[in-house]
Amino acid sequence: MALEIPKIEAILRGIAILLLVSTACLVGLDSQTKFVIVYEKEVTYKDLHALVVLVYVDAVAAAYNLLQLCRCSVSALSKGNFKGSYRYLSWACFVLDQLAAYTTFAAHSAALQHSVLGITGAKVFQWMKWCNRFTRFCFQIGGALTCGYIASVLMVMISFISAFNLFRLYSPKHFLRLKGT
């Protein structure tokens, strides 16, 4: 079981990287041009500020998971005893995994909320509905958000694994005392 956990973590990180990169690419490269009344209107991800934030957050989260995947590979190849520094590394990985999972989920939720305004519009603010005119743009953003939420769920699972890796170092009988001491 202990040998399978790093493999599962590496697989989850690899899939999360692919989903985060595909989300960033789908959102970042999405644009559509249509004639609206008498002028040509192009809609891109830059028109919705939450989508701009989403592209940056997904790119940073994918880079972080790539660095963690490299760390998993290096620690699997080296069979040294890193007990003293491993505790601090486990704490850092745990906190950063939690931060990455919560940040990506928050960015995807903000982008979803902003996208719902694009679907429904807001008469109070005189915002028009976009998705009845720019259907391909909306479908592509919807697919990207689906990929992003799946990546967020995978990152939550990764943070469960990093929590397990951290708290298995501590004694179950003594509060915050390492097992070896």
Swiss-Prot record:
Its main location: membrane. Residues 1-7, 71-98, 162-181 are cytoplasmic. Pfam families: CASP_dom (PF04535). Residues 29-49, 120-140 are extracellular. Keywords: Cell membrane, Membrane, Transmembrane, Transmembrane helix. The keyword Cell membrane applies. It comes from the Eukaryota. It is found in: Cell membrane. The keyword Glycoprotein does not apply. The chain crosses the membrane at residues 8-28, 50-70, 99-119, 141-161. GO terms for cellular component: plasma membrane. It is a multi-pass membrane protein. Homodimer and heterodimers. Belongs to the Casparian strip membrane proteins (CASP) family. NCBIfam families: A_tha_TIGR01569 (TIGR01569). This is CASP-like protein 2C1. It comes from Populus trichocarpa.
